[in-house]
Amino acid sequence: QISEIKKKNIIIICIGTPIDEYMNPVHSVIKECIDQILPYLEKDQLIILRSSVSPKTTEWVSKYINNKKKGIDVVYCPERVVQGETIKEIREIPQIIGAFNQKAFTKALKIFSKISKKVVKATPLEAELSKLFCNAYRYIEFSISNQFYLISEAAGIDFKEIYKIMKKDYSRASNIPSAGFSAGPCLFKDTMQLASFFKNEFSLGQQAMLVNEGLVLSLSEKIAENFDISKLNIGLLGMAFKADSDDIRDSLSYKLKKKLEIDAKKVLTTDPYVKIDENLMPLNEVINKSNLLILCAPHKSYKKINLKGKPVIDVWGFLSNKKNNCKFF
């Protein structure tokens, strides 16, 4: 029962600020949550915001609550684990505590010092920006590799081979990610939240968005240049937004599907982890019925699949041609 909140010393809110169709943060979801719990809040309680929020959200929440009920501390402690690695990483990654005062920091320290040996003290705005900066940096990193992929394509060269050459025994290239679909519920959203905060002058992040989101359009153009798309059954392998996940939120696989469905004879989809899409088909059926296969999410289980000599588009450079005798585009 929500009324149980009044008996607790600490309340953790795991709701962030999504973005709307204009790429602006939406605060209404947090406000609705606060409005629901406000009647049950008591003096000296600590509220911890854990999810990604737009800059200065913690300040707004603190003022909003304390204008109605005094003596309630609000801190921002960003969750920074990689999806699928929470149990391992939550104890390894330093926990950031963004607090307005020492009293609030000390309260939060009591809980987070039990989770991790390392705690970093910050202001709420510093903590908010640290989370958004990290996600935006990663998003931009992916866009660089995707831009390299598109440049290689224009030059008629396989980026996978260039990628191997770049990284071969060269430490300064060790962190360059592969090309591939960069989407999901965090990186794109947080990059756009920074742009909104900075008066839409985050040109680097906005260009990264154009590259990452535009990769899908480039692939559809590539198909049209090499095939009569109207006669194609196209199979999409992996509909989750990332490898070895069942999360389809903001997945570029679905953006590609919608684009291809306009012109292709049929678009077939499969994913070993996704359970909520009724249109998914068994992997072998998709391979057998398709004239062209596109690797959208590089699930580990796909590493050994038999592609039966079908033409393949693999932006990730993940699949091997040694066993499949496929033509890669």
Q: Where on the chain are the PLM-derived regions?
A:
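Structural/interface elements that position substrates and couple domains in central-metabolism enzymes
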Residues: 1-329
